[in-house]
Design a protein with these regions (language model features):
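Extracellular structured ligand-interaction cores
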Residues: 52, 165-167, 216
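Nuclease catalytic cores
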Residues: 23-24, 28-67, 121, 145, ...
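Metal-dependent nuclease catalytic regions and adjoining charged, substrate-binding loops involved
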Residues: 17-18, 116, 198-199, 210-310
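Non-catalytic protein-protein interaction segments used by genome-maintenance enzymes to assemble
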Residues: 138, 143-206, 212
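A non-catalytic, helix-rich entry segment at domain boundaries
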Residues: 58-152
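Active-site-adjacent bridging/hinge elements
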Residues: 29-35, 178-185, 269-273
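Long, acidic, intrinsically disordered low-complexity segments
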Residues: 1-18
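Hydrophobic (often cysteine-bearing) scaffold residues that line and stabilize catalytic clefts
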Residues: 51, 112, 116, 202-205
Length: 310
């Protein structure tokens, strides 16, 4: 259960509520943070292949049912995944974009939905007959999508009122001396580009959520490989690679939390957070490329070049 976690309970987000994604964006590029959170430039709603969202929805419904002792057919969860897909698509006037930013036609959309269901089925099948994900038992998840918040303890140096806040995907147990949390990811099926314990060790999210728990934390990432069931020309494969979920794990301790607080302190100071960003001086952290202003994954390249490009 989420014992020991302070719940936000729908509380309004404030400037001094810092999520892992907010801190991570600033860490990668303060200019991107500035456009997003200070200038509040909103891009037109686009849905880029919401397969991951659909899979998450199916799995979340499954885990919530398991914790309540409810059993349903696989088709029910496939339907929940499709409903989540439809909700995402409604936000962009029914248009879904592929990985290259091109609008998808109805056949491509139907194929993408089928692929998302195939990935979910891999997770569902792995749990049958008492199965686990490399020793991690999703049946142990007690709560999903927990909106947690904690005021930052700056230590003897002190600091301004600041909170860490985030939606913890899966809470397993927070009552013992070591909290147990987890998160579901979909990933490249090539393990070279997928996940490992080393990649899990580098995740800011795991540190932030461990800090929310207020104690050492074992954090598991459960990975669903995005195996393709259609060829490049759109033909369904006769024998697609089976989806076999796997596990990447890491532990967070006081050492990690100390470094996390140091990063937070730098963030608060650099952004002038508690003075409504008045003295924030952002700069672009460009990734060099021969084909444009910057090769980072970012929604603000046009604005960035116009503002910082001279």
């Amino acid at each position: 259960m989420a014992e020991g976690l302070q719940l936000a309970n729908g509380r309004r987000w404030e400037n001094n509520h810092i999520s892992p994604s907010k801190l991570d964006l600033w860490s990668k590029c303060s200019a991107a943070f500035w456009f997003r959170y200070v200038m509040r430039i909103r891009k037109p709603g686009k849905v880029w292949l919401p397969q991951g969202t659909a899979v998450h929805a199916g799995v979340e419904h499954l885990l919530n049912d398991l914790s309540a002792g409810i059993q349903r057919d696989k088709e029910y969860y496939e339907l929940m995944a499709e409903v989540a897909w439809d909700e995402q698509v409604e936000r962009s006037n029914g248009i879904v974009y592929d990985k290259k930013g091109n609008p998808m036609n109805s056949i491509q959309v139907d194929s993408a939905i089928e692929e998302a269901k195939y990935w979910f089925n891999g997770f569902y099948d792995a749990m049958q007959n008492g199965g686990t994900i490399e020793g991690f038992d999703p049946r142990d998840v007690t709560e999903t999508e927990v909106d947690a918040i904690r005021e930052v303890d700056w230590g003897p140096e002190g600091g301004p009122e600041t909170y860490i806040r985030g939606y913890i995907d899966w809470v397993v147990d927070t009552s013992g001396p070591i909290a147990k949390l987890a998160d579901l990811k979909t990933s490249n099926p090539n393990r070279r580009w997928g996940w490992s314990d080393k990649k899990a060790d580098a995740q800011l999210q795991a540190t932030a959520y461990g800090y929310l728990a207020g104690k050492p934390t074992d954090f598991d990432y459960i990975i669903i490989p995005k195996e393709e069931i259609f060829t490049a020309s759109g033909v369904r494969k006769n024998n697609p690679t089976p989806v076999r979920p796997y596990r990447a794990k890491t532990r967070r301790t006081a050492v990690h939390y100390k470094a996390f607080i140091n990063r937070l302190r730098a963030f608060v100071r650099d952004t002038d957070l508690h003075n409504n960003y008045a003295d924030f001086k952002p700069w672009p952290n460009q990734k060099p490329t021969n084909y444009g202003w910057c090769d980072q994954l970012c929604d603000y390249k046009e604005e960035c070049q116009a503002h910082f490009g001279g």
